[in-house]
């Protein structure tokens, strides 16, 4: 397949005002996408964004480009990524566009597309859009220009959809839940969803100012929610990331429940109910403890490359329904077409109610092996993973760990980082091994 020039593993992403993330490119991208998408269907596209201050800039540029190509635009304003996927389906739009850099800091932003069925855009269509980007922008005739309007009830529609994933004969009454919205796109949605299902909700990270998204809050910064769960004597906590497609949880003891443990809960619940279709897809980063726990229940488990795109591909290939990443991207294809943090939280709460169990009781059978992840920043085109020193350090650590451990080195698909992951039985040993390999990577950068 032809190499993509603009689109990465999750759309286009980068520092605002530099590289690809400029208003000029956003305008041209809107036009190019419009040219490709206008060949069929409804001639309308949905745009949603997270709470970054630069979202206004890119929303306007994309709107102008799409209109110049003759497509009508439906503007959602701040809206979680999975909400854009859902509303793209329900409005029967040609595509959905999300302006977000997910868990990245406010000074980054990104643009990604959903197809008309709410799934990520096919590689072939992205390549068609890239081909159009190489052409000069030519506006359609004035009478063919697209129009734009805001969808005022978008949040309400999505809230009702989320609630519909919880059993109609159950409520969350009696549960105290801390909900961390990461000052992101779920700030006006997630607390309301859980309140309307009956929970006593304490919301944090729910006051976005355009600059504070993911800043010491949310699914990538768990200290605040762990402290709040303990201080408020809450039953559990739910932490979402800036665009709402990731979830991490916290039990009543202030202990983090990650994506691997959430996958375990959902798989076991589905097995108990006789609705588990096949097995579970994790990634190369999934904890070995998940693999072993599912093996004990005769639930098949396979690993994809890192990235929810690859988890989805493997789910479709195997015709399975449940998969995800330890970082909190959870896919349940019986409940949506993309990772949805709010819905994943609802499904865990439903399992708690059905089994009359606490969050810690549901995760107790799964024994997590100590896992250490060290990120090493690098610049330039060279690949430090190809050096003899790094390969030697990795081989030596793997020899010492044996069958009860793993080493994984990989480049991030969204940031200039080398990720060093080491897993084994003994945490101090695992930490020492990870730092040793990370030092070798740093020296090679």
Curated annotation (Swiss-Prot):
CDD domains: GlmM. Keywords: Isomerase, Magnesium, Metal-binding, Phosphoprotein. InterPro entries: A-D-PHexomutase_a/b/a-I (IPR005844), A-D-PHexomutase_a/b/a-I/II/III (IPR016055), A-D-PHexomutase_a/b/a-II (IPR005845), A-D-PHexomutase_a/b/a-III (IPR005846), A-D-PHexomutase_C (IPR005843), A-D-PHexomutase_C_sf (IPR036900), A-D-PHexomutase_CS (IPR016066), Alpha-D-phosphohexomutase_SF (IPR005841). Its cofactor is Mg(2+). GO terms for biological process: carbohydrate metabolic process; peptidoglycan biosynthetic process; UDP-N-acetylglucosamine biosynthetic process. It catalyses: alpha-D-glucosamine 1-phosphate = D-glucosamine 6-phosphate. GO terms for cellular component: cytosol. Mg(2+) binds at residues 102, 241, 243, 245. The active site is at 102 (phosphoserine intermediate). Activated by phosphorylation. Signal peptide: none annotated. It holds the Pfam family PGM_PMM_II. Its EC number is 5.4.2.10. The modification Phosphoserine is found at residue 102. The keyword Transport does not apply. GO terms for molecular function: magnesium ion binding; phosphoglucosamine mutase activity; phosphomannomutase activity. Binds 1 Mg(2+) ion per subunit. It is an enzyme of class 5 (isomerase). The keyword Isomerase applies. Belongs to the phosphohexose mutase family. Catalyzes the conversion of glucosamine-6-phosphate to glucosamine-1-phosphate. PANTHER family: PHOSPHOGLUCOMUTASE (ALPHA-D-GLUCOSE-1,6-BISPHOSPHATE-DEPENDENT), PHOSPHOHEXOSE MUTASE. This is Phosphoglucosamine mutase 1. The gene is glmM1.
